[in-house]
A protein has these predicted regions:
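Catalytic machinery of carbohydrate-active enzymes
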Residues: 1-319
């Protein structure tokens, strides 16, 4: 079936699937999103595990290149250089249609993952969906949930068992739990014997001054690799729906995601380590949902879900 996005030529999914299926040299272009990058690295790893040569272009992957040993990872490919750079590959692939840009003018064959699957829905986890697509549709025999990430050898996994890495920011306000609730959650975690640390980029610290004003500790993130290190050596992770949550799961840390969109978050939730989501008991539709869930989901509910996560994880590792 042929589909087309605005400004792009018709896309015949069956033809483009065959192009990727038979490609020996693949260029994987990553969207400028951390979570999407980590998920699509699963396709990269499954292609590589079945004898394909894959080059990754993406700034988030490049920032974590030491965590992906043996994989050819380069910075994002500027569109002005795409025609020349992609000429050496049998197929160029990316998750989204036309993002970071359309590939039709630059690659001999190309592939948009989103054109072949249900993007958001019930009954699946995105990471599992990518693995299953690689096996069932691309015909790759050796497929797993592994995306090639390996913690740096000098690190100690969950060295600080009572430390909780908390990520209060997100890509949009509608995904961001209320700041006052993050403050109260931190205080409740402290009273429960945990050590919450809030991960913030330098430019976010002013916006989140309420955390330091209430005596809560800040981890000032600068390099993404350092953030991965900090989370990998923490015991737990709590945050909004964001790429940092996927990173936490990917480095082996149990994750709790706070959300007002449970259907979307269930399918897009972190999938490498133990994870749970928590959301209000009642959520209206449309814009009301995006405005109100942030306040309706209370800290006591999130702390209860956090305790359920700790119980679940500790039971799993004891079995």
């Amino acid at each position: 079936m042929a589909t087309s996005a605005s400004g792009l030529p018709p896309y015949v999914a069956a033809e483009h699937q065959q192009q990727l299926k038979h490609a020996n040299r693949v260029a994987m272009l990553m969207a400028p999103r951390l979570g999407d990058t980590l998920l699509m690295m699963n396709m990269v790893q499954n292609l590589r595990a079945n004898g394909r040569s894959v080059t990754v272009f993406g700034d988030y992957a490049y920032a974590l290149r030491a965590w992906f040993p043996g994989i050819d990872i380069r910075p994002s490919l500027p569109e002005s250089e795409a025609s020349h750079a992609l000429a050496d590959y049998d197929c160029a692939a990316q998750m989204h249609v036309g993002w970071p840009y359309g590939l039709h003018d630059y690659a001999r064959s190309y592939f948009y993952y989103d054109e072949h699957v249900v993007v958001t829905g019930k009954g699946f986890i995105k990471l599992n969906q990518i693995r299953d697509y690689c096996h069932q549709q691309l015909g790759l025999e050796n497929c797993s949930l592994n995306n090639g990430l390996r913690p740096l050898p000098e690190l100690r996994h969950r060295q600080h068992l009572r430390r909780v890495a908390v990520h209060p920011s997100s890509g949009g306000e509608e995904r961001r739990w209320a700041a006052s609730h993050f403050v109260e959650l931190g205080k409740r975690l402290q009273r429960s014997g945990y050590q919450p640390f809030y991960i913030l980029a330098p430019y976010e610290r002013e916006q989140w001054a309420c955390l330091a004003e209430n005596g809560l500790s800040i981890y000032p993130s600068t390099l993404l690799s350092d953030v991965a290190t900090f989370i990998h050596e923490s015991g737990w992770f709590v945050g909004n729906e964001s790429g940092i949550g996927h990173l936490a799961s990917n480095v082996g840390i149990p994750t709790l995601t706070v959300t007002g969109r449970p259907t979307r978050t269930l399918s897009w939730r972190p999938g490498w380590s133990t994870s749970r989501i928590v959301y209000p008991g009642y959520i209206p539709g449309g814009r009301l949902r995006d405005r109100l869930w942030r306040h309706w989901l209370k800290p006591r509910q999130v702390l209860r879900a956090f305790r359920q996560l700790t119980d679940q994880y500790e039971k799993q590792i004891s079995e």
